[in-house]
């Protein structure tokens, strides 16, 4: 079966399982890497952070589906994980959800801002580095991610 078809079927089932478990799908990848084929499913918890238990329960259900459907003809590794502490910020929902968190935003013109997300209103992200506040239009963001705090 072609990789795109596998990915589509896996994503559909992954979204169903995630919804049942109160989770969301952040990303689904199916690719050949140096150690062989990897089916990587990244789950997210909209109410907080993803626990090891979340990954374990999701993985069990996904394995049942994959074994039953037998979509993948060759050997592969199933990886289930969270987006990580330095997760990418992908859109308005993430900026609202992570208000108060430390983030790094790189704009399309190459400027980099590191600070706490103060708000997201009408397409504008307000971020503060403790000394100054910056307002960044979401359309100007090239990439953004949370920063790990120690």
Curated annotation (Swiss-Prot):
Any one GO cellular component localisation term in the record: cytosol
Pfam families with a match to the protein in the record: DUF150_C, RimP_N
Gene Ontology BP terms: ribosomal small subunit assembly; translation
Localization terms from the record: Cytoplasm
InterPro entries for this protein: Ribosome_maturation_RimP, RimP_C, RimP_C_sf, RimP_N, RimP_N_sf
Keywords: Cytoplasm, Ribosome biogenesis
Function of the molecule: Required for maturation of 30S ribosomal subunits.
HAMAP family xrefs: RimP
Family label: Belongs to the RimP family.
NCBIfam families: PRK14638.1
Protein name: Ribosome maturation factor RimP
Species per Swiss-Prot/TrEMBL record: Thermotoga sp. (strain RQ2)
Native organism taxonomy: Bacteria, Thermotogati, Thermotogota, Thermotogae, Thermotogales
